[in-house]
Design a protein with these regions (language model features):
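Non-catalytic, glycine-rich low-complexity segments
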Residues: 22-71, 77-78, 83, 142-147, ...
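Extracellular glycoside hydrolase catalytic/binding regions
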Residues: 323, 344-516, 521
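Active-site mouth of glycoside hydrolases
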Residues: 63, 119-121, 150-418
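C-terminal motif of bacterial Sec signal peptides marking the signal peptidase cleavage site
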Residues: 17-18
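Solvent-exposed beta-strand/loop surfaces of large extracellular or lumenal domains
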Residues: 72-91, 594-611
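Ligand-binding face of N-terminal immunoglobulin V-set domains in extracellular IgSF glycoproteins
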Residues: 55-60, 64, 77-143
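Aromatic- and carboxylate-lined catalytic core of secreted/periplasmic carbohydrate-active enzymes
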Residues: 50-52, 436-437, 444-451, 458-604, ...
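Bacterial N-terminal signal peptides that target proteins for export
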Residues: 1-8
Length: 631
């Protein structure tokens, strides 16, 4: 039996689709607050006046929790200290506002009760530790949630072994987004943002300063958000452009202390993990709100990188790590499409020994804490090492874990993306907890995805797959632009192996690299072909009912199949292959998809109960889509 038929829907996901509305008595006129289903509601409570630097510390010694209760579901949502409640605009570091962000998954009436308590290190203590109650004005109330609007997608939830799905629309999510710059949040207009060191290690991407995104300022349009007199237009314009070009996700670090960029952290300073910067985090939220509400983008939140995975509590999920994760969940976990990534290049590899690394026990503890504390059950993944051995050492002990839901695969060479995806889709399903697998960093590390007009010089004798087959590649010389190869071997390779898409990494030494990227138009062509590929799958391929298989075609072709119903055969080099339909009854309509030029043509019909030869209609890579015709 195929793995998707064995997959059990989560209780939470079923609740979102199947529950009845709440109390009929409560209406928009009688409730304390109103919001549409899946809309964001900020509830501000007037509590004790304090500051980011106060004693008792509002981030360690207070805990705000709000319980939201619907007839069919109860959510316990962590809150946070919000200074004056308008810190993004005022820059305030003091005030008496305590806030919770709530995004209701069910229409009808909700009741809420907020509890603020005080005690030494109470913020990270077990929930059973009560602390001393602190009065809150407006601690109880009601929320009336109207039905979702006609264009509402809802939250991304796990309702399939290999794919996420929008809870309201039911559409499956395939990812095509930006994996660079990883230090997106090192932006000049965010308060308290700077580099804490000007040292660069050999082989790192280098940046001359913070991001400005001046090339995207013109992409900001009237009505878009900004803060403090018009700040933020560069980064808001940047994500506007990216979404308009077809990208639907962005990968970014929220803490790179001691890492490559050394310019992103949520704290007041880079060396005190007990106090957060309220105005900076409120400004991050302006960006995230725009990406979510206005652009429909996934937030791929990478919580640490390899150089700092033991910075907090030596890698354990101790007080510092719990405090950090709780603040991220409280402020940002409500968004519709959040992926929590426990760390970039997480775990042991040959270079992480010098920094310290998390072992599998620590990794699983971190994932478990995220799963336990996040009321919205957001997607949890780990970013891997690039080569087979270290990746296998990292992932094997994590197989079968219930909290970890997916992989952000790093793959050393483009031609290995299919095999890497296929291996871990299969292994995870065999261990009872299938992973959603995307390729989120493609190697080699120095190159990634070339700019549209760019070529680079090979650093390690890397051979472009297409160039090798054409005559040997160009090691240690200028290489041909690799976008076409990455489209075929990485994006198509991942999708045909049962993966869920890709985010594009820009390498250490290419123009607009992984740290220094200032203009996403440098890869404009890549965003367009990524969108076209995913649009083809979304519009024409019933991929959620299909499984990757190596049994029906010889090497050189990749196949997704729902045997007896539908088949997709991809030929990365074009040419001819055979498709074994000996066990498939009926007649099949054949359509050819020209993957490079985004064109579909009719290929006639193909009979079942035989091995059939299929030949691409022209040079280049093609996909054959076969669907059984009605008798």
């Amino acid at each position: 039996m195929s793995s998707f038929r064995l997959f059990v829907f989560s209780v939470w996901a079923l609740a979102l689709w199947g529950c009845a509305p709440g109390d009929a008595e409560l209406t928009a006129d009688t409730a304390d607050h109103t919001v549409a289903k899946w809309g964001k509601l900020n509830l501000d409570f007037d509590g004790p006046a304090t500051s980011e630097t106060a004693v008792p510390n509002p981030f360690t010694d207070y805990r705000l929790t709000v319980v939201f209760e619907h007839d069919s579901l109860t959510l316990t949502v962590p809150g946070y200290y919000a200074a004056d409640g308008n810190a993004a605009e005022t820059g305030a570091d003091s005030g008496s506002v305590w806030r919770v962000n709530f995004r209701p998954p069910l229409a009808g009436s909700w009741r809420y009760e907020a509890t603020l308590a005080r005690g030494s290190d109470l913020a990270t203590a077990p929930a059973t530790t009560a602390g001393q109650a602190v009065p809150l004005r407006g601690a109880t109330g009601t929320v009336f949630v109207a039905p979702a609007g006609p264009d509402e997608t809802g939250r991304l939830v796990r309702a399939h072994p290999r794919y996420l799905r929008w809870a309201e629309s039911g559409a499956y999510f395939l990812k095509g987004g930006a994996g660079s710059p990883e230090n997106l949040l090192a932006y000049q207009d965010f308060d308290g943002t700077r580099r804490h060191s000007e040292e660069f290690r050999d082989g790192e991407s280098k940046t001359e300063g913070l991001h400005h995104f001046r090339a995207h300022a013109a992409d900001w349009i009237a009505g878009n958000p900004a803060w403090r007199g018009g700040r933020g237009k560069g980064i808001i314009g940047a994500v506007n452009y990216l979404a308009g070009a077809g990208a639907n996700s962005v990968y970014f670090l929220t803490m790179n202390i001691n890492g490559d960029g050394k310019d992103v952290w949520p704290f007041r300073t880079h060396d005190d993990f007990t106090r957060f910067d309220c105005s900076k985090l409120d400004q991050w939220e302006i960006l995230f709100d725009h990406m979510d509400d206005d652009l429909g983008m996934m937030l791929h939140v990478v919580l640490q990188e390899t150089e700092n995975e033991t910075l907090l509590d030596g890698g354990d999920t101790g007080p510092d790590r719990r405090r950090y994760l709780r603040e991220m969940i409280a402020r940002f976990g409500h968004h519709r499409a959040v992926t929590w990534d426990i760390g970039e290049e997480n775990g042991l590899n040959e270079w992480s020994k010098q920094y310290g690394y998390q072992d599998s026990v620590q990794q699983l503890a971190m994932a478990a804490y995220l799963a336990d504390q996040d009321p919205y059950r957001n997607h949890i993944v780990v970013h891997t090492h690039p080569s087979d051995g270290p990746r296998r050492d990292l992932l094997t002990p994590l197989l079968g874990d219930a909290a970890l839901k997916g992989l952000a695969l790093q793959v050393d060479e483009p031609e290995n993306a299919y095999a890497a995806t296929r291996e871990w889709v299969t292994e995870s399903a065999d261990h009872g907890q299938p992973w959603v697998a995307s390729v989120d960093e493609i190697g080699p590390w120095y190159r990634g995805l070339d700019p549209d007009a760019g070529t680079i010089v090979s650093r390690t004798g890397y051979r472009d797959p297409a160039a090798v087959r054409a005559g040997g590649g160009l090691p240690n010389n200028a290489l041909p632009n690799n976008q076409d190869s990455l489209r075929r071997y990485v994006l198509w390779g991942n999708l045909m192996a049962g993966g869920a898409g890709a985010e594009w990494y820009f390498g250490a030494f290419s123009a607009h690299n992984d740290l220094g990227m200032e203009d996403w138009r440098s890869r404009d062509r890549a965003w367009r072909w990524t969108r076209r590929t995913l649009d083809f799958f979304r519009a024409h391929v019933p991929f959620a009912t299909m499984e990757p298989t190596d049994r029906l075609t010889p090497p050189g072709a990749w196949t997704l199949a729902n045997p007896g119903r539908s088949y997709l055969v991809y030929l990365p080099e074009g040419g001819t292959t055979t498709l074994d339909l000996t066990s498939a009854p009926g007649t099949y309509r054949l359509r050819w998809y020209d993957a490079r030029n985004d064109e579909m043509t009719d290929g006639g019909t193909v009979a079942g109960r035989a091995k059939q030869t299929v030949t691409a209609p022209a040079a280049g890579d093609f996909a054959a889509l076969l669907e059984r015709m009605e008798e």
